[in-house]
A protein has these predicted regions:
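Non-globular targeting/processing and membrane-anchoring segments
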Residues: 1-97, 103-108, 117-205
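Loop/turn elements at helix/coil->beta-strand transitions in domains of secreted/extracellular proteins
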Residues: 112-114
Length: 205
């Protein structure tokens, strides 16, 4: 299970007792990482909120929907910025790779903001993305934003992340990070191996 067939880096082999010592040492680092991640999650939740003043309208399956409509009776909303050129017959394969992980979450989670750009922004050569700017001509990028609606119906953006910041939402990458070969991607073209889930070729095909 890995994106490409390169062999993993050679590793030493040791008896079980020595392996267990090394594993327990790493476990202490993993626990520290978990504590740091929990602290970071608390800080993320404590970020100040930004009021959403603009009236956003989306093309829903049954017609136009406002940002408020997307809450569907809930107080919290997570929006994935999915790249889908209207001229294409399918959405971005990389965004689809992330979206494949969402369906299983939705039953549990149920009990365009700074990632798409107007023609004027693209023409200016400085569309804002990930608290920075993108190369000229780029019209949309992947990302994820979180919103909250208060009792008065006011909507606030509470968090956004982009690029490597969305890694935590991709279960496949979390598994690949556990195996000896890791993600094993071309550093100059990460995700070049990714296809829509029904468009992979069988090995040897």
């Amino acid at each position: 299970m890995a994106p490409n067939p390169r062999s993993p880096t050679p590793h030493s082999t040791v008896p079980r007792e020595q392996w267990l010592v090394a594993r327990l040492a790493l476990l202490q680092e993993e626990k520290e990482f978990t504590r740091l991640r929990d602290a970071l999650s608390r800080r993320r939740r404590e970020l100040p909120w930004e009021p959403v003043e603009k009236s956003y309208v989306f093309d829903g399956p049954d017609g136009p929907e406002s940002l408020s409509d997307l809450f569907a009776g809930t107080r919290q909303l997570v929006v994935y910025h999915f790249m889908f050129n209207p001229a294409d017959d399918a959405g971005c394969p990389h965004c689809s790779f992330w979206a494949d992980h969402f369906d299983g979450m939705l039953p549990h989670l149920r009990h365009d903001f700074g990632a798409s750009f107007t023609p004027a922004e693209v023409q200016s050569g400085k569309p804002l993305y990930n608290v920075g700017t993108l190369p000229p001509g780029v019209q949309d990028r992947e990302g994820l934003s979180v919103f909250f609606k208060d009792a008065d119906g006011r909507i606030f953006r509470t968090y956004s992340c982009y690029a490597r910041g969305i890694d935590m939402f991709n279960g496949t990458y979390q598994i690949l990070d556990l195996v000896p070969k890791g993600r094993d991607e071309d550093p100059e073209a990460t995700q070049s191996w990714v296809r829509h889930h029904d468009r992979y070729q069988e090995p040897g095909a």
